[in-house]
A protein has these predicted regions:
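Mobile genetic element proteins and their domesticated derivatives, centered on retroelements
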Residues: 36, 50, 56, 75, ...
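Active-site beta-loop-alpha junctions of metal-dependent nucleic acid enzymes
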Residues: 39-43, 60-83
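Mobile-element integrase/transposase regions
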Residues: 1-47
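RNase H-like two-metal-ion nuclease catalytic core shared by retroviral integrases
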Residues: 91-93, 98-101, 106, 113-134, ...
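Coil-to-beta-strand transition motifs
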Residues: 43-45, 53-58
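Short small-residue beta-strand/loop micro-motif enriched in glycine and branched aliphatics
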Residues: 56-61, 113, 138-140
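C-terminal domain-tail junction helix/linker
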Residues: 138-183
Length: 183
């Protein structure tokens, strides 16, 4: 029902966004990521969305079910190639992030959680979801979305000039400052 919330317990060992270093909030370095899931029609499948806070680089992956296992696999798959550029990950309090400790250990990163019902604390990701929704509308089923579809949308978004980046593209900003690409 509208206004109801999940009462099935809380995530264990969650670290509040208040503990997150100030440099994350100020977008001073590359490697601070925000994560969320976009739910498809009938709440079956989902898209895991990751956005790097400084460069606004967007990563997407479809999961068949919005379970902690599926989301963990998607996050580690998406961020493994950029492991040198992963310092923090910030999520909401969804049950799909129950394996946050395993994700943090695998990627050698710190995992933080925003306050409940405080979407503005992860504004970059909420904005990115709005951009992704231009390609995958809210009422659309994710049944027919392929890996190629998500890669095309990532390519379009990451090559779109952004005013907040002085009209550079996210891929340009990320490439200029990436540890993984510059080593």
């Amino acid at each position: 029902r509208y206004g109801s919330y999940d009462r099935r317990g809380r995530l264990s060992n969650r670290v509040s966004i208040e503990q997150r270093p100030a440099e994350v909030e100020n977008r001073q370095r590359l490697g601070d990521w925000e994560v969320d899931t976009m739910i498809g029609k009938r709440h079956k499948q989902a898209l895991v969305t990751l956005i790097e806070r400084k460069s606004r680089l967007v990563l997407l992956r479809k999961v068949e079910q919005r379970t902690a296992e599926a989301v963990e696999g998607a996050i580690t798959h998406l961020l493994k190639p950029w492991i040198l550029d992963v310092h923090t990950i910030t999520a909401d309090n969804g049950k799909e992030f129950a394996h946050h400790e395993r994700i943090a250990e695998e990627l050698n990163a710190d995992f933080y959680f925003a306050h409940p019902n405080a979407a503005w604390e992860r504004g970059s990701n909420e904005n990115a979801i709005g951009l992704v929704r231009q390609y995958f509308p809210k009422k659309q089923s994710f049944d027919h979305i392929t890996l190629e579809d998500t890669e095309l949308v990532m390519n379009l978004l990451n090559n779109r000039p952004r005013k907040c980046l002085d009209f550079k593209t996210p891929i340009e900003v990320f490439s200029e400052q990436s540890v993984a690409l510059n080593t």
